[in-house]
Amino acid sequence: MVSKLSQLQTELLAALLESGLSKEALIQALGEPGPYLMVGEGPLDKGESCGGSRGDLTELPNGLGETRGSEDDTDDDGEDFAPPILKELENLSPEEAAHQKAVVESLLQEDPWRVAKMVKSYLQQHNIPQREVVDTTGLNQSHLSQHLNKGTPMKTQKRAALYTWYVRKQREVAQQFTHAGQGGLIEEPTGDELPTKKGRRNRFKWGPASQQILFQAYERQKNPSKEERETLVEECNRAECIQRGVSPSQAQGLGSNLVTEVRVYNWFANRRKEEAFRHKLAMDTYNGPPPGPGPGPALPAHSSPGLPTTTLSPSKVHGVRYGQSATSEAAEVPSSSGGPLVTVSAALHQVSPTGLEPSSLLSTEAKLVSATGGPLPPVSTLTALHSLEQTSPGLNQQPQNLIMASLPGVMTIGPGEPASLGPTFTNTGASTLVIGLASTQAQSVPVINSMGSSLTTLQPVQFSQPLHPSYQQPLMPPVQSHVAQSPFMATMAQLQSPHALYSHKPEVAQYTHTSLLPQTMLITDTNLSTLASLTPTKQVFTSDTEASSEPGLHEPPSPATTIHIPSQDPSNIQHLQPAHRLSTSPTVSSSSLVLYQSSDSNGHSHLLPSNHSVIETFISTQMASSSQ
């Protein structure tokens, strides 16, 4: 005996005294054995003897009162949970109720995890879903699943409800197989069958034994005949009976799990559909997306993978205009030298100024850019127009070889379009000029003019910005082709870098978002192979000239800067002058001259004078430039 009370015992005594119970009554109650010790069939814990609901345990016919002393049964809903299946035992005969109570009591005395595995095995053997257990016992679906699969602890009263259902289900199944065709109907009017009728009927579920037979038959014949299906029905029912431990002659006792010919037919139909779907999915995965037209090289890794490519004829390329929405098209461009075709991927989207770096000039990703008005987006890659078919009326006499390098803006002037450009530009020759214009400042466009297969000189042509929007209506899109790595391409990359030729000029502006490329290179030639051996022999960079005038006044051209280039032939020396500006807005212009000399000196017999020259049609009264 403990001579001193603990703190908990002291608090309990104080609570009893505060409830109105006198000390004499408390001592008398402790001295006399009260009826609270006689509840149920065994002694209970003294700590729970004061509960007011102990009298309810005497009404339970399964004798579960002795197990109510567990601590987990006094949780939140432990006192409120009353499984309906336990109340239904009162409707059974006394012998049947006593038998089920004895079996449930024995199961409660065993290890809960071992009994849970036994119940789970029984459910799998007879293809009984857990939903049926939940509908009958009132247990929580998640709690029941965790208890059967993981051994999660469950309160004694809930386990008693589960074990009661388990014992009753065993009796029902035994009666079904014993009375094959009618045993299941004998027990339906009884009270213990009422909860099962309220729930949904069990769905048919194929057992593992039947599935093994059907899959083996499917390998032999994917669409069996009616006779073959009936044979499979007998085999499946026999296997299900053997799985349940009963004779195959008692197949009618399977109840809702009985295999029929219709169910076998549906199973084969579903398997055929699944196989066809898997085959189609595998073929789609194997084939992948359809390849693009043309045997040209694949797009590099830096190409936009999200842009689909479609076939676009060269005649349709001329009609493409720059829009707000980004699209992508591919054009089949025939080579002017009769070589293989190359596929040009054209993306209609604006290019950031970072794409104007010299390192990206040789990129094979083409940008098809045009506009219906306003400033044009920059073009960051080399663009080839010489290989396009001359199907457009405005470009029916375009020179064959024309390469445009890093144009911040593109403007096309054709023989049939002088009216749209007004009197400022006239083109009476047989050629077409494609030039690049910046969006904020005037440009001095050096044009390399040639005749035959020789490259002669670089002619600066001066323009100013901004032009009137109507001047940009006939703009045509420059299309870039896949250009192979060559010395000429490397030379072009050097031309676009301001530090390559004009490294001694510290005032050269860097590439910025507001000021794009200061110059645009235009090369015309009939044979690109002669351009591969070009080497710069002399470079002259003239100082920038700035001029400003008020609106409405025409300012005369600034004094010309004469540049003499030594050459073997005096006729090769060009006298260059800046041309008239096209508008009176303040402009900043710069002109430069670079002479390229081919390794073959025999091909330099003539210079600018050319009947089909690009420059000849523009060096007119509107542009003051002379040649000697």
Swiss-Prot record:
Q: Which domain of life is it from?
A: Eukaryota
Query: Which compartments is it annotated to reside in?
Result: Nucleus
| Tagged with keyword Transmembrane helix | no
SMART domains recorded? HOX (SM00389)
Q: Which residues carry this modification: Phosphothreonine?
A: 74
- Which ranges carry the POU-specific atypical domain? 87-182
Looking up PANTHER family in the UniProt record yields:
HEPATOCYTE NUCLEAR FACTOR 1, HEPATOCYTE NUCLEAR FACTOR 1-ALPHA
Report quaternary structure and partners.
Answer: Binds DNA as a dimer. Heterotetramer with PCBD1; formed by a dimer of dimers. Interacts with PCBD1. Interacts with BHLHE41. Interacts with NR5A2. Interacts with SPOP; this interaction promotes ubiquitination and degradation of HNF1A.
This chain belongs to which protein, by name? Hepatocyte nuclear factor 1-alpha
Question: Gene encoding this polypeptide?
Answer: Hnf1a
